[in-house]
Swiss-Prot record:
Compositionally biased residues, Polar residues: 1237-1261
Null allele phenotype: Seems to stimulate mitochondrial biogenesis and especially mitochondrial protein synthesis.
Keywords: Mitochondrion, Protein biosynthesis, Repeat, Repressor, Transit peptide, Translation regulation
Protein name: Pentatricopeptide repeat-containing protein 5, mitochondrial
Subcellular localization: Mitochondrion
InterPro entries, A to Z: Pentatricopeptide_rpt, TPR-like_helical_dom_sf
Length: 1261
């Protein structure tokens, strides 16, 4: 169905004026519903005071289901749909039925809006298909219909809800709620847990069950949604809140003051977001190149079309009709403040007309009085501002620095300027300065407001004088960047370069580093005034950041340098300006398209070059070097003239070979080839490429390639120059295979080279039929889905017939078999490939070696999967003997599988392997970087991890969500919250971003376990739920930890999470029981409840519903030990044996701590040594640390040192070893008195009598 503006407003009218709305004479000539409702106040009150049965009034005086327009005799209202800011009279002289037809949704004249424009997208986006017209007619034809929408699903709710949540909540049975109260209680638990997205999903599920949705239920849903930033982050999401409100009206539930305040609060917050976003986008479009501005413009226009405050003001004013509502001072403060800051003048006037200034207590909230003064000043009502100041007897801000007092005077200062009384503002400031001489302080916010507004009027010199006086007389005052930028901007707008230069020198350029638009105007002023020396000094440090935030190309700056004969300065600045390392390293740069910006900068630079400079060889070489430094081939507009001019110098040999490096010449060949491919072989592009190939073939210029596949691909366009291509092909291929290119497109590159290097398709020994079948099996499914038995059956036929597969199939076959752990089959394929190698070598040894290099590369991969590291090294050595090295992906697998038994520092191993790839000039891939980053992150070597991540981006590789997940995890491991948040935001803004649950879980776990911040944990949880991926079981466990381990502990919310999982059919696993046991036993010390939960988990296992793991037993043991019930803790160990669950290091850690607590060190040592037994998981560094602490607790330094020696033999990283050994060194340095281990027996008194000791011993035995 379609939700029109008229439909929305008339739903509100129905609630504010009643179902049947009387229309009285004289006729109201109003063009929109908002004003009509406002002016109906008196008439409606009259109708209510003179109560009369509806039937006794003339039927035409009521708006019923069929009367959507307003009429009186020959004058009809509501035919047109003007904006709310305009007043248009409906055209007279039309018959009534004509206007009714116009309101029919099937009519082409059907009005789409009397609703505020902020909701126009809601009206348009909720249209169903044409097939839904019948439903539409039954509901939308009459906005005042007594029928509800309970039987119709809403496409808005269906499309705006993430699929994962929709599918999970679809499993909830409405019959599970026995009453509305039970539903409301569950809703309250979700809301109190701030699970706003789940609250909305639950609402969507029950919206067809009006018996469950009461006013209280609606308010709970609205309050939960309006406090969540997710629902305010976009126009689509804010519409969900409005939609819930409209559903309530359709259900004939009258909103109360809580309802109105909640929805209006949400609209005010949305208005602030829209305002800030518009400001940001405007700065990036006003100075941008048209091609970039065109990309940003649609988003900007969409935001500008939103008017959330129009809706907020309308809802507030209409709510006053026939509603005895008393709004809170906080509500007035927020609404008035929002409209005065972000609203239009007409919105502010409409609001102030309805605000009961005489009755509300402005001192009821600290923000209300300042908001009122600011609003009245903007409304040009300065006398009212003075009246408020007198009424509440505000003190001088130099003596009373309370927040309300200072902000009120700041509002008065704004009011002076809003009403064109800046002279009076200056007089007021003078009075403040006279009092400042008496050691009183002028609040900085008032000073900044005065200076900023004065500068914006154009009185920048006077503002600067006031600023100097403030700095001189007030020692604590420091001008804000916005104040400084306002003064500088005004000077630039007035073209006063002398003042601007002096002002920047006085306050330093660094003070303006974040004022990008002002810096842009300043640099432009320097360029126009010809101050090129100062321009060079000031442009160099800021040009990159200013461009990133404004999308400005600075062609005027380059033009100024060129016109003043400083072309070298311009070229150096250009190189820095588009340096990919600078742009990629600036993660906060908001440029929507950095590539488009770089192209615009380059094209703008070429345009300001004179015709002579466009042919200058040094300029051309500098430009080529700059282009070569970019990540990809820049598709600039001057590619052809650049290549044509520089090729002319090369062909005529006017360019000495020593002036052009092999890499620059190689780039010229690649760039020319790229141009041929891009233009699909135009005549000019092919001429340039052939000329460069001739220069390469005669040996005059040496070349070094990075993207040789582009050159090889361009050969298909040079069929008329086959002899030239043949003469250079072998040299280029030889250059290509050195380094064995292996980036993301490596497989395609290798295919290109294979076609050039050896065309083996016509080998007679290849069985084409089996080769085709095997190739199809290998490529049509993932390796895990390939039927290995059938695959190897086909391969067996080749052995029987002495036939072979195509050489390129063998590496893929080995890879698939390896991933399926069929290493015996891999060995047979390897032996078979040796026979093919011998056959190929009879024709071409070079081609045979290349084939064997591919096979050996695959065998290295296979050996790494099998963890046969000696074999991997052997195969690698054989490759090197042939002149080849493994691919990047092969090295990545070596790193991933590099952990040998007993090796506890695999990060160093990973770095050594990675350094080997660099030594051999292997082109790294994303997969390779991910492998190294993962190892470094787990080893907490974050500095190296971050450095490698930056190196990866600088090399032009685009990080994936896996990459970001790794570096985010590394940042979390060292507790760097700002870095983790920065990386997370960067990950979500990546163009190739594919959401994965792991990074979200990492951030949630980090906020819960490291930062102890429940609010942020819930923020990331809701962000996860807003994607199209489902939360994992671990996510729910972390959510339980957020409520159950962080203060204030909320066990009710923990239960709500479990109830949510149960109602949505999410399996409750052993980890969830373990988390709940920990919360009950360790956090709230309710050991009985924890034990009950533990027994319930065992019963669930016995019933076959869950699978037990060590975490469950660990939580119960820790719970018992925390409550001094070590005996029962030992009994849990017996339960583990009964359920075939092995001890692990973490359970033993708990037992060691428990026994240490009661002085039973020998028992602790028993379990410590038990981990070395066969079938146990082994010790962790924390296990050694706990045992060391146990011995030190009884002053047995010698035994503690023995444990440290054991640790050293395990080859753990040195920092880990040093940290634990320092415990012993510190203890030995103190030389404490030694206690006998026998004291442990005396400590048993804390456990009870001798029978307790017997219980422990028997449990252990």
């Amino acid at each position: 169905m379609v939700y029109t503006k008229a439909w929305f407003l008339q739903n509100i009218a129905r609630q504010t004026l009643g179902k049947n709305v009387a229309v009285h004479r004289p006729p109201l000539k109003l063009g929109n519903m908002t004003n009509w409702i406002q002016q109906q106040q008196a008439q409606t009150n009259l109708s209510l005071s003179n109560t009369k049965a509806p039937g006794s009034l003339d039927e035409r005086l009521f708006l019923t289901e069929d009367d959507i327009i307003f009429h009186d005799r020959s004058i009809q209202l509501g035919y047109f749909d003007p904006s709310l800011s305009e007043r248009k009279q409906s055209p007279p002289g039309k018959s009534l039925h004509r206007f009714v037809d116009n309101l029919n949704p099937n009519s082409s004249h059907f009005s789409a809006s009397l609703l505020p424009a902020s909701l126009s997208s809601l009206c348009d986006s909720t249209c169903g298909d044409v097939d839904d017209e019948q439903q539409f007619n039954s509901l939308a034809t009459s906005p005042l219909s007594t029928e509800t929408q309970s039987e119709v699903s809403d496409p808005l709710l269906d499309t705006l809800t993430p699929n994962s949540l929709e599918s999970s909540f679809a499993s909830i049975s409405l019959n599970s709620f026995t009453s509305a109260n039970e539903f409301i209680q569950f809703l309250k638990r979700l809301a109190s847990s701030k699970l706003s997205i789940h609250t909305f999903d639950l609402y969507k599920l029950v919206r067809n069950s009006p018996e469950l949705l009461t006013l209280e239920a609606y308010n709970i849903v609205l309050q939960c949604m309006s406090t969540d930033d997710y629902f305010l982050s976009s126009s689509k999401n804010i519409q969900k809140i409005i939609k819930v409100y409209v559903d309530m009206l359709n259900s004939f539930i009258s909103p109360n003051v809580t309802t109105f305040e909640t929805v209006i609060f949400a609209l005010c917050r949305r208005a602030k977001f829209v305002h800030q976003k518009i400001e940001s986008l405007s700065k990036r479009t006003i100075y941008a190149h048209p091609s970039i501005a065109k990309e940003i413009q649609p988003e900007l226009l969409d935001l500008q079309s939103e008017m959330p405050l129009q809706t907020a003001v309308f809802m507030f004013t209409s709510s006053l009709i026939n509603h005895d509502l008393i709004y809170s001072p906080q509500f007035y403060a927020i609404l008035i403040e929002s409209v005065s800051l972000y609203g239009t003048q007409s919105q502010l006037d409409s609001l102030l007309e309805c605000v009961p200034l005489g009755t509300i207590e402005a001192n009821g909230h600290p923000d209300l009085l300042p908001a009122l003064i600011r609003a009245l000043g903007r409304a040009k009502r300065l006398n009212s501002c003075f009246q408020l100041l007198e009424r509440y007897n505000l003190s001088d801000p130099t003596s009373d620095t309370s927040m309300t007092n200072v902000r009120s005077w700041e509002g008065l200062m704004e009011a002076y300027f809003d009403t064109d009384h800046h002279v009076e503002a200056s007089a007021l400031m003078k009075s403040f300065f006279r009092k400042a001489d008496s050691n009183q302080v002028i609040p900085s916010s008032i000073l900044d407001c005065f200076l900023r507004r004065l500068a914006q009027l154009g009185h920048y010199k006077e503002s600067a004088e006031w600023l100097g006086m403030a700095i001189e007389k007030i020692s604590t005052y420091k001008a804000s960047p916005s104040t400084l930028s306002s003064i500088l901007e005004a000077a630039c707008l007035n073209n006063n370069d002398k003042f601007a230069i002096a002002f920047v020198r006085k306050y330093t350029l660094s003070r303006f580093s974040d004022c990008h638009a002002v810096l842009l105007r300043y640099l432009d002023l320097l360029a126009r005034s010809g101050n090129v020396d100062l321009l060079h000094l000031h442009a160099y440090p800021v040009i990159c950041s200013v461009s990133s935030h404004t999308n400005f190309t600075f062609s005027n700056v380059y033009k100024a340098f060129i016109e003043n004969g400083k072309i070298d300065v311009a070229l150096r600045l250009l190189r820095k300006h588009i340096d990919p390392k600078v742009s990629l390293g600036n993660n906060t740069a908001p440029s929507s398209n950095s590539v488009a910006l770089q192209l615009s900068i380059l094209n703008g630079f070429w345009e300001v070059l004179t015709e002579e400079l466009q042919k200058d060889v040094h300029v051309l070489l500098s430009l080529v070097s700059t282009l070569e430094n970019q990540v990809n081939f820049p598709q600039v507009d001057f590619t052809t003239p650049l290549l044509r001019h520089i090729t002319g110098y090369l062909v005529s040999r006017r360019l000495e070979p020593e002036l052009i490096s092999p890499r620059v010449f190689g780039f010229l060949l690649e760039y020319a080839a790229f141009n041929v491919v891009q233009t699909e072989g135009t005549f000019t592009s092919k001429v340039i490429l052939t000329d460069l190939l001739k220069c390469y073939s005669n040996g005059t210029y040496k070349a070094s390639f990075k993207n040789v596949h582009v050159v090889l691909r361009s050969f298909t366009y040079l069929k008329e120059d086959e002899m030239l291509v043949a003469s250079v092909r072998d040299d280029i291929v030889s250059e290509a295979v050195v380094g064995f290119s292996t980036d993301n497109n490596g497989q395609k590159i290798l295919a290109d080279i294979s076609q050039v290097c050896y065309c083996l398709d016509d080998l007679e020994c290849i069985d084409q039929s089996i080769n085709s079948l095997v190739s199809k099996m290998l490529t049509s499914a993932s390796p895990e889905q390939v039927d290995v038995n059938i695959l190897f059956f086909q391969f067996g036929k080749l052995i029987e017939t002495n036939k072979f597969l195509h050489p390129e199939v063998y590496p893929t076959l080995i890879s698939v078999l390896s991933k399926n752990k069929r290493f015996d089959a891999v060995q047979r394929v390897f032996e078979h490939s040796k026979h093919l190698y011998r056959k190929i070598s009879t024709k071409s040894l070079e081609k045979a070696n290349w084939f064997m290099a591919l096979i050996l590369d695959a065998m290295i991969l296979s050996s790494s999967f099998a963890r046969q590291f000696k074999s991997s090294n052997l195969f690698c050595d054989n490759m090197k003997m042939l002149g080849y090295i493994p691919r990047a992906s092969t090295f990545a697998h070596l790193i991933n599988n590099s952990t040998r038994r007993g090796d506890t520092d695999d990060a160093t191993t990973a770095l050594n392997i990675f350094e080997e790839t660099k030594r051999h000039n292997v082109k790294p891939s994303v997969f390779l970087y991910n492998a190294v980053l993962s190892k470094l992150g787990r080893a907490r070597r974050t500095t190296e991890c971050w450095k490698l991540f930056q190196e990866m981006k600088e090399s032009g590789l685009l990080p994936t969500s896996v990459t970001y997940g790794t570096v985010i995890n590394a940042a979390c491991r060292i507790g760097d919250e700002s870095l983790a948040e920065k990386l997370f935001a960067e990950m979500e803004n990546q163009p190739n971003y594919q959401p994965r649950v792991a990074p979200y879980n990492t951030m949630i776990q980090f906020e819960v376990q490291t930062m102890f911040n429940r609010e942020k944990a819930l923020f990331y949880y809701n962000r996860l739920c807003a994607t199209d991926i489902e939360p994992s079981s671990h996510t729910y466990k972390l959510l339980m930890d957020a409520y159950g381990t962080l203060k204030p502990v909320n066990v009710g919310s923990v239960k709500a999470v479990l109830e949510l999982m149960e109602r949505t059919d999410v399996p409750i696993l052993s980890m969830h029981y373990a988390a709940y046991i920990h919360i009950l036993g360790n956090v709230v010390s309710d050991v009985q409840a924890a034990t009950s939960c533990y027994m319930n988990a065992l019963a669930k296992h016995d019933a076959g519903e869950i699978q037990l793991d060590a975490n469950l037993f660990q939580s119960q043991i820790e719970s018992l030990i925390a409550n001094d019930r070590i005996v029962e803790g030992i009994q849990i160990v017996s339960d583990m044996k009964r359920y075939n669950v092995s001890l692990n290091a973490y359970i033993v850690n708990a037992l060691i701590k428990g026994f240490t607590k009661v002085g039973m060190i020998s028992k602790a040592r028993y379990y410590f040594d038990l981990l070395e037994c066969e079938g146990m998981s082994g010790k962790e560094p924390s296990t050694y640390e706990n045992m060391v602490r146990a011995y030190l607790s009884v002053n047995d330094g010698r035994k503690a040192m023995e444990i440290v020696e054991q640790l050293k033999r395990k080859r753990y990283p040195l920092p880990v070893v040093n940290r634990i050994s320092s415990l012993v060194n510190s203890h030995m340095g103190q030389k404490p008195k030694r206690r006998s281990l026998n004291t442990s027996h005396s400590s048993l008194a804390s456990l009870g009598n001798a029978s307790t000791q017997h219980s422990i011993n028997s449990s252990i035995n």
